[in-house]
Every structure is written in structure tokens, then in C-alpha cells.
A protein has these predicted regions:
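Glycine-rich phosphate-binding loop plus the immediately following alpha-helix
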Residues: 154-199, 223-224, 228-233
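Glycine-rich phosphate-binding/hydrolytic loop that grips phosphoryl groups
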Residues: 309-347
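Conserved phosphate-binding/catalytic loops in two-lobed NTP-binding clefts
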Residues: 117-118, 278, 296-321
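N-terminal beta-alpha supersecondary unit
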Residues: 5-81, 87-91, 120, 124
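Single conserved hydrophobic/aromatic residue that forms the stacking wall/gate
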Residues: 353-362
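Conserved phosphate-binding catalytic cores of ATP/NTP-utilizing and phosphoryl-transfer enzymes
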Residues: 1-4, 117-139, 324
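Short beta-strand scaffold segments in enzyme catalytic cores
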Residues: 18-24, 140, 148-152
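A contiguous, well-structured pocket-lining segment that forms one wall/lid of small-molecule binding clefts
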Residues: 36, 193-279, 285-302, 329, ...
Length: 362
């Protein structure tokens, strides 16, 4: 694309947040967030203790168009001043993805502007370049409600997975435990807050796969262990509940630390001729302060700088979608109007798509 800067309207609807953002992206791989609107569906899902896909989809339908108007107003732009529209096309809940992607297709068709379908995971993976002004290569821990992965980000569009979860993601481990303990929704923040009041050494929960040489995670057995322990000591008073939460969170953190350190050692050994300065955490669970603090210690140990986006850009947002859409559009990539929504879509599949070398950052 010949333009030096593009203004991209981004739409995120892969789960239970409806989000719209406008980001100005330059060929030097720098971005300016002009607006960033997020509508949370917490109140709608709270009675059920988790996300109900049909309710999520209906809420996206009801709120998306007003949010687009709000984002344009906040950015002081008219719709015809947008250079392209990007929407999450996977992975995620298929109903929500269809709502956002269909809306983006309508805008692209009506304005005759490019459409870019964005991988939600790539949005999280590249957010630190936008928010923290860093450049690849870097080692990424992508830790969210549906994914827990260790990834080598070689460049924009080139990713190598070092480890992933073989069952539940870390975010699921938080959410399912919180639902079982009946401590509130959303479960992750509720359990984190409760853990602050407890003794994290009170219960000795397992650290699955800690002795495995691989960098994969497993959280399902840990969750089962918590349920068994809680049933042994019923009824549970407030102090015991806090101790359970603290000990459980500590076990999750240890699992993340153990595997992150193995991944760092592996990547640094295999890339001795490449300077890798950053260990990055992104995704909703990366907003957990205890996890951030533990990862910073690991980064320091390996003479790396720990980077995590501001908390509002760790959780789902549309700025990351607009950002990736702009990066890809400036590299000559756009999608046809028949691009499908995809419930599953790995980052490594993206690496099979040719993408030009990123412009040198000034």
C-alpha cells in the first residue's frame, strides 16, 4: 500500500466483550490509538457463572453499531475517513465472530475499503509493539482464558510455538475454580483478589508436568485437586477459602514460571547469534499482578527485560485488532469478502502466509 499511514477501524467480538477501536498505523510499525471502546457483558453472564455463547452473540448484535459511532466520535473522524476495517475472524466463539466479521464486511463493501481478518492471538502477540514500543524478536507468554502458549515471535507474521496447554488454559483454571468455589464472576479477578487474603503455602497442590523436559502446560489435574481438597474440608469458612485460593493461584504461577524458564533457556540456546532482549506476557491472565511479578523475576534472571502491556490492553480489546489489521494492510495484505469465521486458528498457521519484511523502525 502506498500510503505512509492508515487509519484502521478494528472490531473485536470473539468472546464476551464487544470492542471497537480506531488506530493510526504507520509504515515504520508505530501506532497511535485514536479511540478504544470496550463494552463488557459481565452483568449478562454473571448469573450463569460463565460465558453463555448465545447471550454473547445477541449482545454483540445489539451493541456493535452504537460502539462504532462512539469510536468514530471519540477519534473525531467520519466513517469515510477510514482506510480499512479489521475484525477478529478467529479463534473464538463462532457466533460472536460472525457478528463482528459480518459487520466489518458490510463496512468494507459499503465504503469500498480493504477488509482484514485478524487472528485474535496475533492481536495479543503484537500488542506490546504498539503499547510498549518494542521490536521483535521476543519470547512471548500468551496467557488468556482460552490459550496458554509460549511463542518465539521472530518478526511480524512469523511465529514458532514452543509450548502450549495439553488440556485447560490458565484462564480456564482460574475461572472454573472460581465457579466451583462460588466466589464471583469474572472468576480470574475474583480469585486473584481473594488470594491476596490467604496463605499461599497452606495447601500443597500439584505442579503438573514440572519434571517434563517439554514446555507444555497442564492445568486440568490441578483444578481437580482443588475440588477434591475443598470437598474434604466442607463447610468452608472465609479464611479457608482465601487459603485455598492463594495456594491454588501459587500452583498456577509455579507452573507458568517453570515452563517459561524452560522455554527461555531453550530459545536462547537455539538462537545464540540472535539478540533477544524481551520476555513478554500478553493476554487477559497477564493482567494478574502476582503472575507479572513472578515473570519479571525470571526475565531478570536471564538478563532480559520483562514487558507486559497496560492491563486494559491485556484483556480483549479492538485496538490490537486494528493495529494488526494496519500492519498487514501496509504490507499489502487484505482479505476477500467471503473470508470465513474460524473457531480454531493457530498462530503457526499464520506463519505459513508470506508477509514482507517489516519496515525498519526509526
Amino acid at each position: 500500500m502506498k500510503k505512509e499511514n492508515v487509519k484502521i477501524l478494528g472490531i473485536e467480538s470473539s468472546c464476551d466483550e464487544t470492542a471497537v477501536s480506531i488506530v493510526e498505523v504507520s509504515k515504520s510499525d508505530k501506532g497511535k490509538i485514536l479511540s478504544n471502546i470496550v463494552f463488557s457483558q459481565i452483568d449478562e453472564h454473571s448469573p450463569f457463572g460463565g460465558v453463555v455463547p448465545e447471550i454473547a452473540s445477541r449482545s454483540h448484535v445489539e451493541t456493535l453499531n452504537p460502539l462504532i459511532d462512539q469510536a468514530l466520535e471519540e477519534a473525531c473522524l467520519k466513517i469515510d475517513e477510514i482506510d480499512g476495517v479489521a475484525a477478529t475472524s478467529g479463534p473464538g466463539l463462532i457466533g460472536g465472530l460472525i457478528v463482528g466479521l459480518t459487520t466489518a464486511k458490510g463496512i468494507a463493501l459499503g465504503l469500498n475499503i480493504p477488509l482484514i481478518g485478524v487472528n485474535h492471538l496475533e492481536g495479543h502477540a503484537l500488542t506490546p509493539i504498539l503499547t510498549n514500543d518494542i521490536s521483535p524478536p521476543y519470547i512471548l507468554l500468551l496467557v488468556s482464558g482460552g490459550h496458554t502458549q509460549l511463542i518465539m515471535v521472530k518478526s511480524i507474521g512469523q511465529y514458532s510455538q514452543i509450548g502450549t496447554t495439553i488440556d485447560d488454559a490458565a484462564g480456564e483454571a482460574f475461572d472454573k475454580a472460581a465457579k466451583f468455589l462460588d466466589i464471583g464472576y469474572p472468576g480470574g479477578p475474583a480469585l486473584e483478589n481473594l488470594a491476596k487474603k490467604g496463605n499461599n503455602k497452606k495447601y500443597n497442590f500439584p505442579r503438573p508436568l514440572q519434571n517434563s523436559s517439554e514446555c507444555n502446560f497442564s492445568f486440568s489435574g490441578l483444578k481437580t485437586s482443588l475440588i477434591r481438597e475443598a470437598k474434604k474440608i466442607e463447610p468452608i469458612n472465609d479464611g479457608t477459602l482465601a487459603d485455598l485460593a492463594a495456594s491454588y493461584q501459587e500452583a498456577i504461577i509455579d507452573c507458568i514460571k517453570i515452563k517459561s524458564e524452560k522455554a527461555i533457556r531453550k530459545i536462547l540456546k537455539e538462537n545464540q547469534n540472535t539478540e533477544i532482549q524481551y520476555f513478554v506476557a500478553s493476554g487477559g491472565v497477564a493482567s494478574n499482578k502476582a503472575i507479572r511479578d513472578s515473570l519479571e523475576v525470571i526475565a531478570d534472571k536471564h538478563a532480559m527485560q520483562f514487558i507486559a502491556p497496560p492491563m486494559k490492553f491485556c484483556t480483549d480489546n479492538a485496538a490490537m485488532i486494528a493495529w494488526v489489521g494496519g500492519l498487514r494492510l501496509l504490507r499489502g495484505q487484505k482479505d476477500k469478502l467471503n473470508i470465513p469465521a474460524r473457531a480454531r486458528w493457530s498462530l503457526e498457521e499464520l506463519s505459513l502466509i508470506h508477509i514482507s519484511e517489516p519496515t525498519r523502525r526509526s
